[in-house]
């Protein structure tokens, strides 16, 4: 669960929509730090081999399938998602990456 501007957003719901987008192999959604909203929806996306994805294309897909406030505010395209030995995505590592990239006040 992430809270953006006082609204509860379930990452799994956003992930399920993004996984139906053409060219998406894997996706993981986490909350990224935001000074105004507290957290914003950030999607880490792995493209299928040979597929080119764009934030605009994924955004258009999300707008058709979920409420606007739930769509990711940022897309990060990666070659692979960090996983543990059992194949579970390590969302903690993704959040740490976002916190390391965010400017400090």
Each language-model region and where it sits:
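Acidic/polar alpha-helix N-cap and adjacent early helical turns
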Residues: 96-105
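AMP-binding/adenylate-forming catalytic core of the ANL superfamily
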Residues: 1-70, 79-96
């Amino acid at each position: 669960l992430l809270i953006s501007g006082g609204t509860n957003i379930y990452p799994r719901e956003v992930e399920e929509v993004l996984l139906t987008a053409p060219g998406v192999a894997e996706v993981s959604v986490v909350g990224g730090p935001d000074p105004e909203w507290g957290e914003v929806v950030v999607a880490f996306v792995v493209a299928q081999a040979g597929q080119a994805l764009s934030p605009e294309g994924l955004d258009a897909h999300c707008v058709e399938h979920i409420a606007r406030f739930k769509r990711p505010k940022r897309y990060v395209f990666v070659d692979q998602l960090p996983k543990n030995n059992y194949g579970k995505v390590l969302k903690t590592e993704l959040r740490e990456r976002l916190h390391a990239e965010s400017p400090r006040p």
